[in-house]
From Swiss-Prot:
Gene3D superfamilies xref list: Leucine Dehydrogenase, chain A, domain 1 (3.40.50.10860), NAD(P)-binding Rossmann-like Domain (3.40.50.720)
Binding-site list for NADP(+): 166-168, 191, 232
Protein name (database record): Bifunctional protein FolD
Top-rank taxon: Bacteria
Family to which the UniProt record says this protein belongs: Belongs to the tetrahydrofolate dehydrogenase/cyclohydrolase family.
Length: 285
């Protein structure tokens, strides 16, 4: 029997309707559109496409987007000065840094100039610390989207055993913390985990965030388990696959996100949700 498909496109569409209504209400309260500022260094085509998609999404929901494109040769001081100006600008409600930064630029230095109240990626040390303490403010968008998929599709988390494969500061670790705060028993797996399959076969929920195409095979999956696949791996033929062997896993799992069309569409919408949170919190409304 095939697994239930956790369709991120369908969920994202429902969320867009909800967020558009919230932004309309917010605009009435503050007499303007909430503004997101996106800082991009260089003009990498993939990064540019992503930034344009954020611009289109923002405008479609009634928010405004300002894109600041800095040259590849920008210095650390110039980049930090740009972020400082945006942090101090009362007309900007949230800031998104297009990552990763080019080699030679320090993310830590840039984050030191970003006020946590405007950190739409949820990666500022203060926001990371609040999440670790169980007092989340602005949460990284990708794991927030994963939790939203679990919630909206009514996947039980409390009391379940969950494994997160991947320990990045932006996806793996925050996802593990969110699952822990939802009362799951969580194991974090990584490149040094011995016998990954033995760990995963004990788990009711598997979160794949390793960045390795089709790392997780059907033999590693407990029958009926729920799989959230954050992997976005482009193969030599141009096709995109996740970190899970979807074609085989769909015959074993109870529920699974496809790639593409699973976690990706929800991630971008979570960015707008963070913009609304940031605006309300900063303006005290």
């Amino acid at each position: 029997m095939s697994a239930r498909i956790l369709d991120g496109r369908v969920l994202a569409q429902a969320l867009r309707h909800e967020l558009a209504a919230q932004i309309a209400e917010l605009r009435e309260r503050i007499d303007r559109a909430p503004v997101i500022a996106v800082v991009q260094v260089g003009e990498d085509p993939a990064a540019t496409r992503y930034v344009r998609s954020i611009d289109r999404l923002s405008q479609s929901l009634g928010a405004a987007c300002r894109t600041i494109i800095l040259p590849d040769v920008v210095t650390q001081a110039e980049l930090e000065a740009t972020v400082s100006r945006l942090s101090a600008d009362d007309r900007v409600d949230g800031i998104l840094l297009q990552l990763p930064l080019p080699a030679g630029l320090s993310l830590d230095g840039v984050l030191s100039r970003l006020i946590p109240e405007k950190d739409l990626d949820g990666i500022h040390p203060i926001n990371a610390g609040l999440l670790a303490q169980g007092r989340p403010a602005l949460i990284p968008n990708t794991p927030a989207g994963g939790m939203e998929l679990l919630r909206r599709y009514e996947i039980e988390v409390r009391g379940k055993r969950a494994a997160v494969v991947g320990r990045s500061a932006i996806v793996g670790r925050p996802m593990a913390l969110l699952l822990l705060q939802a009362d799951a028993t969580v194991t974090i797996c990584h490149s040094r985990t011995s016998d990954l399959g033995a760990v995963l076969r004990e788990c009711d929920i598997i979160v794949a965030a390793a960045g390795r195409p089709q790392l997780i095979t059907a033999e590693m999956i407990k029958p009926g388990a729920t799989i959230i696949d954050f992997g976005t791996n482009v193969l030599a033929d141009g096709s995109m696959v996740g970190d899970v062997d979807f074609a085989a896993a769909v015959e074993v799992a109870g529920a699974i996100t496809p790639v593409p069309g699973g976690t990706g569409p929800v991630t971008n919408v979570m960015l707008i949700q963070n913009l609304i949170k940031a605006t309300r919190s900063r303006l005290g409304i």
